[in-house]
Amino acid sequence: MKIVFLEPLGLSIDRIENECKTLKASGHEVVVYPDRCPEKNIERAADADIVIESNMPLRKDFFEACPKLKMLSIAFTGLDHIDLAECERRGILVKNAAGYSTEAVAEEAICMMIGLYRHIIENDAITRSCSGLPLSPGKEISNKTVGVIGLGAIGQRTAKLAQAFGCNVIAWNRTPKEIEGVTIVDKETLF
């Protein structure tokens, strides 16, 4: 089988090559491209059996140009950049890295909220440049209303963390969903 990495996925090519030694020893061909180049995706994957990538959009034209493709491995949680209907029609197995970053992304969202309310970036710059007195310490996020767009794993975890800080959480989700302590609203209300 020919396995094509359309991009290095944030890893060194040496590391990917090292991780793929067993595959190569078993007779598989592994090709790793050193950069993200969406306009070359079709050319790079045309004769691949397996394609590995993160979040570059792959649509019907890509799958039409890759008749041997049997599997698509997405090193990312979301799949909204993949034409899943076309994959299903062609019998292409699609796998993703579901759940790998849920906690990290939710924590980052909370960090950004705290940073915004507490003027962390501005105060850091003022302090490092010795250019004056820091801004006021800002405000707490407790008792603020936090809006969450999408209640997948990341959205639910972000809502739960916001609740732990004493926030009122409102959310919009594409499909109806009930989450304890979260008020579901329409998009217009959220924005």
Feature annotation, model-predicted:
Residues 57-69, 84-86:
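Rossmann-fold NAD(P) dinucleotide-binding segment
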Residues 1-48:
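N-terminal glycine-/charge-rich "phosphate-binding" loop or analogous flexible N-terminal tail
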Residues 44-45, 63-66, 141, 189-191:
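A short, aliphatic-rich alpha-helical micro-motif
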Residues 154:
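Hydrophobic/small residue at the entry helix of a nucleotide-binding pocket
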Residues 59-63, 175-191:
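Rossmann-like adenosine-cofactor binding region
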Residues 90-92, 97-145, 149, 160, ...:
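Phosphate-binding beta-alpha-beta segment of Rossmann-like dinucleotide-binding domains, i.e.
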Residues 80-92:
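Rossmann-fold NAD(P)-binding glycine/threonine-rich loop
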